[in-house]
């Protein structure tokens, strides 16, 4: 087998219906030097049985049955830590990739040795259709991580990750209040990687994402406000830990601290008033509105346009100073409890001073 070994992590739970199609897609990849690591969560015997034909017929496939529930983040992180390859790819159990997907990404990774991730276009279909090309991250580490903060785009998460960069990250952290979901942990992970290398979009290969209505991110849209608030605050604290450390001076770190808080506390979506009418239109079955629905679907599939009108997407949006104060309080509580961020070492400040200044800027202003 020519070329570096690539580990493909396939975490799965109750995915027996779609899993064989995905595994066959991996088995027939044009790039053959693969280590396909299937991690079956919570002793799910039915999903494990769906893997057996591949385990018997191809030595590149191996499987671990987890005795207890890890959740998607914990299960995915396990495959990252148990990788054998020089590169790693996360593969959702119910998605597929183009036949030369791995080969194309490996070729790009060898061509761009400074890239932490080489990733492909993501084509979503099902409940909605969209083409996502993500946001390439180039330049110096600060420029890359601030661009990552600005857009918070996760398309690159499905790309080819360089093992040497992956080894220098914290992996996928678990939130203590909802470890089976751990909203935003992949975004924190991507920000860590953005400090370690470039994100390169590779033309040609395609990741096919299936939106069947039960996807995790669709379920999050139905969360109650208090859960969205807590998850958003947790992610903000995680991002502070990663982004602020990239500053090259105390002044730059203070500026980056403010930029993170601004990104999470201050809504900036001039097109918000269109959301509810567009959603009602999408649910309508009126024949007279069909041409408009076709136009809306086309607009939603236009990645640059979608990005331009929804650049600052937020899981939880504050609408008044009291909500911002409450969100800010949770962010600081999370930072203190985690113990990974030291305001004295990073910003030559105290928790009390930081909170006072943050409230003055984002609550009292």
Model-predicted segments: where are they?
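Short loop->beta transition adjacent to catalytic acidic/histidine clusters or analogous donor-positioning motifs
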Residues: 4-6, 27-38, 59-62
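Short, well-formed alpha-helical segments that are part of the catalytic scaffolds
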Residues: 15-28
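Conserved nucleotide-sugar donor-binding catalytic segment
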Residues: 142-223
């Amino acid at each position: 087998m020519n070329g570096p070994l690539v580990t493909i992590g396939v975490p799965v739970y109750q995915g027996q219906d779609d899993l064989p199609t995905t595994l066959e897609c991996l088995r027939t990849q044009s790039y053959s030097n693969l280590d396909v690591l299937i991690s079956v969560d919570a002793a799910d015997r039915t999903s494990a049985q769906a893997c057996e034909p591949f385990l018997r017929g191809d030595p590149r496939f191996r499987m671990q049955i987890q005795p207890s529930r890890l959740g998607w983040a914990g299960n995915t992180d396990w495959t990252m830590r148990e990788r054998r390859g020089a590169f790693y790819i996360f593969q959702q159990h119910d998605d597929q990739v183009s036949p030369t997907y791995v080969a194309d990404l490996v070729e790009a990774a060898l061509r761009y040795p400074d890239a932490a991730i080489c990733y492909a276009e993501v084509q979503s279909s099902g409940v909605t259709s969209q083409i996502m090309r993500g946001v390439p991250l180039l330049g110096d580490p600060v420029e890359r991580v601030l661009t990552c903060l600005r857009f918070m785009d996760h398309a690159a998460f499905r790309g080819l990750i360089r093992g040497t960069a992956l080894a220098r990250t914290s992996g996928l952290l678990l939130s203590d209040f909802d470890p089976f979901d751990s909203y935003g942990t992949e975004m924190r992970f991507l920000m860590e990687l953005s400090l370690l290398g470039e994100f390169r979009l590779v033309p040609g290969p395609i990741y096919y994402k299936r939106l069947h209505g039960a996807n995790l991110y669709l379920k999050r849209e139905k969360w109650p406000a208090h859960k969205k608030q807590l998850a958003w605050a947790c992610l903000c604290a995680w991002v502070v830990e990663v982004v602020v450390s990239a500053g090259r001076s105390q002044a730059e770190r203070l500026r980056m601290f403010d930029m993170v808080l601004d990104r999470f506390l201050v809504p900036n979506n001039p097109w918000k008033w269109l959301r509810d009418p567009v959603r009602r239109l999408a649910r309508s079955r009126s024949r007279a509105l069909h041409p408009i629905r076709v136009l809306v679907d086309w607009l939603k599939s236009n990645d640059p346009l979608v990005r331009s009108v929804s650049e600052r997407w937020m899981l939880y949006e504050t609408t008044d100073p009291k909500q911002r104060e409450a969100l800010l309080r949770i962010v600081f509580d999370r930072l203190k409890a985690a113990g990974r961020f030291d305001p004295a070492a990073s910003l030559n400040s105290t928790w009390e001073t930081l909170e006072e200044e943050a409230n003055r800027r984002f609550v009292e202003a």
